[in-house]
């Protein structure tokens, strides 16, 4: 299964509360924080929802 590194590129101040919960589910709380995830259908949906706040790199 493919792995990706997800980095929060923009601040979560002033965004929709549901998007903030999605960031927390991804393990991201602060700007510049990164986490490694396995690419799953659930993760793809989360990345599509809050992609405007993130930078995604394939490993």
Swiss-Prot record:
Cited Gene3D superfamilies = Ribosomal protein L30, ferredoxin-like fold domain
Tell me which Gene Ontology terms the entry assigns under biological process: translation
Q: Where are the transmembrane segments?
A: none
Q: Which Pfam families match?
A: Ribosomal_L30
Q: Which InterPro entries match?
A: Ribo_uL30_ferredoxin-like_sf, Ribosomal_uL30_bac-type, Ribosomal_uL30_ferredoxin-like
Keywords, comma-separated and alphabetical = Ribonucleoprotein, Ribosomal protein
A single Gene Ontology CC term? large ribosomal subunit
Q: Does the keyword field hold Transmembrane? A: no
**Source organism, top-level taxon:** Bacteria
- Gene Ontology MF terms: structural constituent of ribosome
Q: How does it assemble?
A: Part of the 50S ribosomal subunit.
Family statement drawn from the similarity comment of this UniProt entry? Belongs to the universal ribosomal protein uL30 family.
Q: Under which name does UniProt file this protein? A: Large ribosomal subunit protein uL30
Record gene name:
rpmD
């Amino acid at each position: 299964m493919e792995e990706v590194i997800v980095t929060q590129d923009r601040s979560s101040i002033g965004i929709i509360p549901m998007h903030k919960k999605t960031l927390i589910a991804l393990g991201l709380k602060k700007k510049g924080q990164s986490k490694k995830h396995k690419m799953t259908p659930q993760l793809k949906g989360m990345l599509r929802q809050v992609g405007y706040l993130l930078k995604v790199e394939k490993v």
